[in-house]
Amino acid sequence: MARVTVEDCLPLVDNRFALVLLATKRTRQLMAGARPLQGHAKNKAPVVALREIATGKVRFDRSVRDALSGKFDKEKSTIPAGQTRTLR
């Protein structure tokens, strides 16, 4: 695999948003010193993470819906009661 694309990973991950979360988490693990599951020492951590996802070596350990809803619940809990947050 000369180049990794989102399309290479989508058959193994439900949607693009979940793919971003998974790739980000794995990239952070690699940058913190985790060993790559594939031998790509020359590539940067995000490329290694996407290659691992595309080959099925990295995946969510729970459903994507649970992972995403947990992320949103965490964000909601940081907003004080009665207030809203507007993104611009």
Curated annotation (Swiss-Prot):
**Stored Gene3D superfamilies:** 3.90.940.10
Please give the superkingdom of this protein's source: Bacteria
The record's Gene Ontology biological-process terms are: DNA-templated transcription
Q: What class of enzyme is it?
A: transferase
The GO molecular function terms of this record are: DNA binding; DNA-directed RNA polymerase activity
* A cellular component annotation (GO) from this entry: DNA-directed RNA polymerase complex
- Keyword flag Transferase: yes
InterPro entries the UniProt entry points to: DNA-dir_RNA_pol_omega (IPR003716), Pol_omega/Rpo6/RPB6 (IPR006110), RPB6/omega-like_sf (IPR036161)
Known EC number(s)?
A: 2.7.7.6
- Which keywords belong to this entry? DNA-directed RNA polymerase, Nucleotidyltransferase, Transcription, Transferase
**Entry-linked SUPFAM superfamilies:** RPB6/omega subunit-like
Subunit comment: The RNAP catalytic core consists of 2 alpha, 1 beta, 1 beta' and 1 omega subunit. When a sigma factor is associated with the core the holoenzyme is formed, which can initiate transcription.
Family label: Belongs to the RNA polymerase subunit omega family.
The protein's role, per its UniProt record: Promotes RNA polymerase assembly. Latches the N- and C-terminal regions of the beta' subunit thereby facilitating its interaction with the beta and alpha subunits.
Q: What is this protein called?
A: DNA-directed RNA polymerase subunit omega
The taxonomy runs: Bacteria, Pseudomonadati, Myxococcota, Myxococcia, Myxococcales
The gene behind this protein is rpoZ
